[in-house]
Amino acid sequence: MKRLLIYFTIVISSFSYSQKKALVGGTLIDGYGNTPITDSVILIDGDIITGVGTIETLSIPDSYEIISTEGMSVLPGLWDMHVHLMINGHSDYGYWDRTYPELFQDVIMPSSAHQLLMAGVTSARDLGGPLQESINVRDKINSGEIPGPTMYVSGPFIQKKPYPGTELFRWGVDGEKDARKKIRILADAGVDCIKLIDQDQMTYEELSAIVDEAHKHNLKVIAHSHRPEEIRLGLKAGIDNFEHTGLSSAPRYPDDVIEMINERTAQMNIGPLFWTPTIEGLYNYTDLIDSNEHLDNESWHLGLPDSIITDIKNSIKKPGELPYFQLTPIRKPTLKTKFNQLRDAGVVMLIGTDSGIPMKFHSQSTWNELDVWVNVMGVDPLDAIKSATYWPSFFMGVDNKVGTISVGKQADIIAVKGNVLKYISLLQNVSFVMKKGEVVKR
């Protein structure tokens, strides 16, 4: 116990708890996509940004602790809009769901959250998890009891019928009345959004009732887009945000689906249509087969007991033989076409990763998604960063509080050595993380 207390004393003393801080010298990327500011100065009082300028234009009061960001890119804390805290990269969902539910709340989900935060993710959306555990972990993070990003949680997946053995985190609906009831239960419990899957197996009346009831409770609805009919019905019902680059190995989205998306994005009066393509896991899978060194990166061990680490390692010893990914090499050539179809149709893209699924570790997924967007899909780095900062905050309705480095907003800020606009992959080594004005990594 004495050694443990000494350890925590050392850790705590290594962080700064001064209420007034100045980040000085780095190149500031504000999250809006504006021209970066060199030799920047950011003033923070408590958890709020109180000044943004340059060394020449903004004076630093004597009472402020100066933190040098010279030679660094400084940007808003990242968002990941599609994570699964309840899983940590194990390849066998059925086994995991049977073995670890009792550890979800106190071990596994906190571990996932901590890994995300250390990777520079200061806000994240958890889509599909056990209801009370999701809310409890979110609230413990918000109260400062455990480290992690500010979490926005959906609670259970809503679908026509839960898969056998998944009833803890998948809820079925049986008719319009039951659909509304399930959404009211989730709303009353305090979820932040609603997550649908397999909505093409529902009746349109059930789907429409879900969306209508969610919107009555000011909850956005996020839905899968694996199959054309999921998209068609979802657009008709008013889904706010689609997930994944779907349609398996089909070479492109059907013309009628793209036309429906065009019609939806043309309606400025109801706001943007959002899409989270979660493309990196599909694109990089074949590289993992040839070189799986990232599986040996110990960053994903953070917070997990040795027994679970060993269990995960054993499950992914042969990445080329995992049933989950057998179609992935065939899907890879279709990804860029589909990604560009969606962009050309006017959807607003969001950075999300599906982190937690087999071999997709919370500590590594977000930067990899950004890297594929920029270096494979051809997205401008400033636009990619905006999709990981401003746009997620806008979608979740908190853009007045977070998402950009602006006066009056919460001080969620990260910094990395070097120029991320030239080398976006530098985000794999985030040097500095500030959440709500507190330095949590330095």
Regions found by a protein language model. Give the residues of each.
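Metal-associated gating/positioning segment near the N- to mid-region
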Residues: 72-140, 164, 205, 226-244
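Bacterial Sec-dependent N-terminal signal peptides
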Residues: 1-20
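His/Asp/Glu-enriched, well-ordered alpha-helical/loop segment
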Residues: 216, 319-323, 332-419
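Divalent metal-coordination and catalytic microenvironments
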Residues: 26, 42, 47, 71, ...
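Active-site core of metal-dependent hydrolases
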Residues: 196-331, 357, 377-378, 396, ...
